[in-house]
């Protein structure tokens, strides 16, 4: 099935490309989402008229992503985690945790846009990539630190008064 892309589609093509895809992918995803249209002569002519409007829209999205990239690059996240002996983490730091921490800083990003090869399992500073647009990838510094160690032994223990026998 030949289609004209109306937007940049990851791993497929850019705005205006004529691509060949399997019929199911075209009918069930690209066409209903408005990401493509059938590649006929009439549609090619109509698309050329619409291309400037779509290109301006894509440029606006790219500019907004670049601005957000600068904001993310200036942000350093500090994520406190529970650790055991030898500073070994309980669990790991995932994209969901990083996304929630970014949301607390006022940057709302879908966790699927945060690119981690594997979950973070060590303390320290880690560079995490965030794909904001097909052309814009921001780098975020995530500092994983140990939570304040609050132990139960530090709390004063109150001894119970001995009970008096019942009469």
From Swiss-Prot:
SUPFAM superfamilies: L9 N-domain-like (SSF55658), Ribosomal protein L9 C-domain (SSF55653). The keyword Signal does not apply. InterPro entries: Ribosomal_bL9 (IPR000244), Ribosomal_bL9/RNase_H1_N (IPR009027), Ribosomal_bL9_bac/chp (IPR020594), Ribosomal_bL9_C (IPR020069), Ribosomal_bL9_C_sf (IPR036791), Ribosomal_bL9_N (IPR020070), Ribosomal_bL9_N_sf (IPR036935). Keywords: Ribonucleoprotein, Ribosomal protein, RNA-binding, rRNA-binding. The keyword rRNA-binding applies. GO terms for cellular component: ribonucleoprotein complex; ribosome. One of its GO terms (biological process) is translation. GO terms for molecular function: rRNA binding; structural constituent of ribosome. Binds to the 23S rRNA. Belongs to the bacterial ribosomal protein bL9 family. This is Large ribosomal subunit protein bL9. The gene is rplI.
């Amino acid at each position: 099935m030949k289609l004209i892309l109306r937007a940049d589609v990851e791993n497929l093509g850019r705005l205006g490309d004529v691509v060949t895809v399997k019929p199911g992918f075209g009918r069930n995803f690209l066409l209903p989402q408005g990401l493509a249209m059938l590649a006929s002569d009439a549609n090619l002519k109509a698309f050329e008229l619409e291309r400037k409007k779509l290109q301006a829209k894509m440029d606006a999205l790219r500019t907004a992503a670049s601005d957000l990239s600068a904001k993310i690059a200036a942000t350093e996240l500090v994520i406190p985690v529970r650790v055991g002996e030898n500073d070994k983490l309980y669990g790991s730091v995932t994209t969901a945790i990083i996304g929630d921490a970014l949301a607390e800083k006022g940057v709302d990003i879908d966790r699927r846009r945060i690119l981690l090869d594997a979950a973070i399992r060590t303390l320290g500073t880690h560079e995490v990539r965030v794909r904001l647009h097909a052309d814009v990838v921001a780098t975020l510094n995530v500092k994983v630190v140990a939570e304040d160690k609050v132990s139960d032994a530090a709390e004063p223990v109150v001894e119970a008064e001995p009970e008096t026998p019942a009469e």
